[in-house]
UniProtKB/Swiss-Prot annotation:
InterPro entries: SurE, SurE-like_Pase/nucleotidase, SurE-like_sf
GO molecular function, one term: 5'-nucleotidase activity
One Pfam family of this chain: SurE
Species in which this protein is naturally found: Photobacterium profundum (strain SS9)
Family under the similarity heading: Belongs to the SurE nucleotidase family.
Function: Nucleotidase that shows phosphatase activity on nucleoside 5'-monophosphates.
GO cellular component annotations of the record: cytoplasm
Protein's name in the database: 5'-nucleotidase SurE
Nucleotide-binding in keyword set: yes
Location (main, coarse): cytoplasm
Gene for this chain: surE
Length: 249
């Protein structure tokens, strides 16, 4: 089995290296990841300057670009074969609810999917038990060998930050939602220039039973199928009726 791994925390992050160690038990692992932390990069591509790469070891490539750049480069240039799966992670922290819109980890999996390779994103809801998340991924990848992912779907997996033996199982979930994050943190640099930091994410808003938030609170692994098609299919008819009315004015 051939596995491509990427992330948004950077090639030297603990999560991706723990993941690579465990998945290497299943086959050949190649890491192509950002040269530094690119959290929050979403699906951005680098278009205003060329990408530079560096070989960090055997089958380990760092890229001075976004997670999407990394997977795009790996699949379209670096690898001379198609991997069996793209695994993005292990993210340092949750990707729950609308986090997925900003997540570079989810974006790396999305790019793999765009380019025709089955893909999953894995996040640890914390920063301690990366071994737990890695074992969860290993189990899922083994099962994917026997039964592939549903067509046109990406799996977004969030693992509670607890020892593997304490997990209560898994739950297929929908995305929950957070309250809007409105806080900005104002600061002043040593030269007296004003600067701003983005504040913390909003608190949970939609986090009831059936959501990814609820699952991890119950010490369950949350597995959320995602799709790339952003069309609001249930709104097509109503928007067409609205446009017909607008067109008469």
């Amino acid at each position: 089995m051939r596995i491509l791994i990427s992330n948004d925390d950077g090639i030297f992050a603990e999560g991706i290296n723990t993941l690579a160690t465990v998945l290497s038990e299943l086959g050949e692992v190649t890491i192509v990841a950002p040269d530094r932390n690119r959290s929050g990069a979403s699906n951005s591509l680098t278009l205003d300057y060329p990408l530079r790469i560096r070989e960090e070891g055997d089958r380990r490539i760092s890229v001075d670009g976004t997670p999407t750049d990394c997977v795009h480069f790996a699949l379209n240039e670096w690898l001379d074969y198609r991997p069996d799966i793209v695994v993005a992670g292990i993210n340092h922290g949750a990707n729950l609810g609308d986090d997925v819109l900003y997540s570079g980890t989810v974006a790396a999996a999305t790019e793999g999917h765009f380019l025709g390779v089955p893909a999953i994103a894995i996040s640890l809801v914390g920063s301690t038990h990366f071994d737990t998340a890695a074992q969860v991924v290993k189990s899922i990848v083994v099962n994917l060998l026997e039964k592939p992912l549903p067509k046109n779907k990406i799996l977004n997996i969030n693992v509670p930050d607890i020892p593997f033996a304490e997990l209560k199982g898994w739950k297929v979930t929908r995305l929950g939602a957070r309250h809007r994050a409105e806080q900005m943190v104002k600061d002043v640099d040593p030269r007296g220039k004003v600067l701003y930091w983005l504040g913390p994410p909003g608190a949970c808003q939609d986090a009831g039973p059936g959501t990814d938030f609820h699952a991890v609170e119950q010490n369950l692994v949350s597995i959320t199928p995602l799709q790339v098609d952003l069309t609001a299919h249930d709104a097509l008819e109503s928007v067409e009726l609205w446009m017909n009315e607008v067109g008469k004015k």
